[in-house]
Amino acid sequence: MTDQNNAPITAISRHRIGIDGEGVTTLVVFHSCPLRCRWCLNPQTWREGSNFRMMTPQQLLMSVQMDDLYFQATGGGITFGGGEPALRSIFIEEFRRIAPQEWKLNIETSLNVPQEHIDRLSGIIDEWAIDIKDMDPDIYKEYTGRNNAQVVSNLEFL
């Protein structure tokens, strides 16, 4: 097991209905984000000194498998959020390999990550919730502190 198979997780929020995808979902909130959005909803995922715990995909599965009945009965599953979950593509790929295949995997992402992550996730994510922020590059940069060229490129890729 490599360090890439460990991921910093800020929170796990269970029994979410109609918020993060179909059916009952569990939101897994990853720590860290490349953006610094002016009105960030989850600053605890990137602020210095924020709490998180390192988990392996196996540990995450053990933590959420108690909700299997809900996922199976409602067509739900796991939603990866953050922070920026697409940065944890290797972790998510391993989780998909070991989790029940009936579980849906969703992601809430800014897409402002290297395309290799999107490529790795493209075959395993069932539903993408993409927070584009703004398509105007100047407004995007003012709002997030970053350029949106990677977002546009990843949208075209998907």
Model-derived regions, located:
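Flexible, glycine- and charge-enriched loops at secondary-structure boundaries
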Residues: S50-P57, T144-N148
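A short linear-motif detector with a strong N-terminal bias
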Residues: Q4-I9, P57-Q59, N106-T109
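Conserved AdoMet/S-adenosylmethionine-binding subsite of the radical SAM
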Residues: L61, Q65-L69, T74-G77, G81-L158
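N-terminal [4Fe-4S]-dependent radical SAM core
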Residues: M1-M54, M66-Q72
